[in-house]
Every structure is written in C-alpha cells, then in structure tokens.
Amino acid sequence: MDTRSEVLLRQAELFQGSLLLAGLAADDLLGRLPNARGWSWHAGDQAALEARFPGRSHFGVDAPAQSFDSAVLFLPKSKDLTDYLLNALASRLAGRELYLVGEKRSGVESAAKQLNPFGKPRKLDSARHCQLWQVTVANAPEPLTLQSLAQEYELPLAEGPLKVISLPGVFSHGRLDRGTALLLEHLDHLPAGHLLDFGCGAGVLGATVKRRYPDSRVTLLDVDAFAAASSRLTLAANGLEAEVLTGDGIDAAPMGLNGILTNPPFHTGVHTDYQATENLLRKAAKHLQKGGELRVVANSFLRYQPLIEEHLGPCAIKAEGQGFRIYRAKRG
C-alpha cells in the first residue's frame, strides 16, 4: 500500500464519513474506507481503481459533482496544480475538514502553507516519511476556473506563430522544454497517414504536426487529464482539429499508425520512472504499420538506441544538441 494511504489509515476514525480522496494512489484505500470516493486525473490509476472499485472513482480535471463532508488531497508535484486542487476542494467545504497528505521529500511541509488562506492548518501525523495536515475551512474561496490558471505562450514557427495553452500540472508548464524544441526542428519528411503524439503534454508536437501536415490524421495521447485538456485548448486556439485521448501508455494508442513522435515522460510525481517509455519502445512495432516510423527525443545519457534496435529495427541518431538526441527508426 502507498505510504500516504498508510498514514491516513493511522487516523482512520477521522475518515468514516462521506469523504473525497483527490489524487489517491491505485491501492486498497477505497476498500478500507467504505464511505470514501476517489478523484483521479491519472488514467492508469483510474483504470486500476475502476477495476477494483467500480463506480467509486471519478476521472477528470473537475471535482466530482457529488457532495462530500471532507476531502483529502494527495499532494501532487506541481505547486500550481496544488493551488487549483485545494481551491476546488475548499470551495465545497465551508466549515468542514480539508486534509493534505504527502511525502516529506515532495515538500509537503512547505505545501501545507497553501492551506493558510482557508483557516489555521495543523499537522496531525508524521510517519512513513510522510505528513498529514488538516484545516477546518473557515474561509471558503470562490471556485477558480481551470482556464483562469492557464498560461499562454507563442512559438515562432516557420508556418507562423503557434499558440500554446498550458494548464497547471502539465509538463514544462508555461514554457517550451529543450527536448521538444529540438524535435520541432526535425519534423521533416514525416510519413503520410496517421501520426501519434505520445505523451502530448500541452499539445505542442501534435498541433505543430497537424498544421504542417494538414492531410494527416493526428492523435494526441497522454496519461494525464490535465495534459489532455491543455492539448484540446492548444488545438482550439490554433483552429486545428485532432483526436485527443487519455490512456495509460502505448497500450491505449490506436493500431495501424504511420508515425509515432514523442518526447517521452520519465517522472511519476517526484519519482523517476522509465517504464512508460521503455514499454513504448518495446511495443511501438505492434502499433506501427510496415514502414511506419518512430521518432523519439530523449536525454543523451538514456540508452534507448539498443532497446529500439532490439524491438523495432535499425535506429539512427537524426540530431543532437543541448544534451538531447533524436532517435529515428522504421518498422521493417
């Protein structure tokens, strides 16, 4: 069981009423708290929760419509996302209890200060390298719209400026990261047909490809509901139409693709996690048509080339710079 869930269960008597668990782990906590419901924005966690506890976890960027008497936020990595989520919960909990739980190394003690606008927070427990904080919501805020927290910036591209709409919690929020910047310079000669932006984030790659190759069918895929929402906003801001999916890794992608483009993620919260990328490299051939191409940008120190060659075919380094490499391979 997740250590944060273990800390909650040390205080289980506090959590017997109607409770919302926001950002919960995909463990047995719902089984131990029969009156609790979940709210997840991670497609993999949501699928696991739905399989074990059907109908008890809500997925998306907005809090569930059902009422709740108290709520626990599992601290996310992003401070901006924490602000949005605490606001969404506190706005529904006037005079009631809001809890924050997180690992010490994720900065939960500092994040507890974000409870100050709502009342007087206090630390309830410290165990398993985690802390549990509580505040009685004396000052319930007006709910913020997610779009009011969006950051917009423009990328000067050959086809004209591209507007990017980035939401809290999305990778490289409010700015272009170096890996994607390098890949944007090397989108020439993509195969015609159906192209996938894997781990789409705010939709920079997918939107750029759709504008440059308007006759191609473009799909954008991410595990995170906030990323999918960002991608939809980016596409709309540029008058583009493409399919946006949420799903847990390459297994959620369509079959019969002509190309896969990715600046793949390697963090889950504060933890380094290469599983989604390695799974993509192992299974890309299954999702690509014969002659279909995989184009990956990654940190130069990551040894992806042997993995690509083992599972897909000969792999070339198309470009490198700023500590990144672009790998290119085709399915034979």
Curated annotation (Swiss-Prot):
What Pfam families does the record point to? MTS, MTS_N
What Enzyme Commission number(s) apply to this enzyme?
Answer: 2.1.1.172
InterPro entries tied to this protein: Mtase_sm_N (IPR013675), rRNA_ssu_MeTfrase_C (IPR023543), RsmC/RlmG (IPR046977), SAM-dependent_MTases_sf (IPR029063), Small_mtfrase_dom (IPR007848)
Q: Which GO terms describe its molecular function?
A: 16S rRNA (guanine(1207)-N(2))-methyltransferase activity
Protein family per UniProt: Belongs to the methyltransferase superfamily. RsmC family.
Function, in words: Specifically methylates the guanine in position 1207 of 16S rRNA in the 30S particle.
Write the protein's name: Ribosomal RNA small subunit methyltransferase C
